[in-house]
Amino acid sequence: VYKRQVQVPHYNYVGDSILGYKSHMGAGSITSNVKSDKTLVVVKDNRDSGEEIETGLKKFGAMLGDHVEVGCNSVLNPGTVICPNCNVYPLSSVRGVIPANHIYKDADHIVAKKEK
């Protein structure tokens, strides 16, 4: 599902995903929608709560909030949630939940954006 003004312009694959208003997928970035072991997709909150949400689905890609920027050649693994106003560095492999207003550099470096 694409909301208004979504940009997926170059050699992307978006499978079974929701892309928010004015989100942008850089060249070659994909939303993977099936786990390699073919089990049901679970959304795992990798923040403090550690909550898990069972989707009951074998095919479930990613959910991107409004104004999300995904860098070139990034992979959003099944069940990834990227909250609004986030940036994902190029060549990233993202999984879990990325909180709003953050920059995903790699799995160990997810930093809050500085207010302007």
Model-derived segments and their meaning:
Residues 3-116:
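Glycine-rich hexapeptide-repeat left-handed beta-helix
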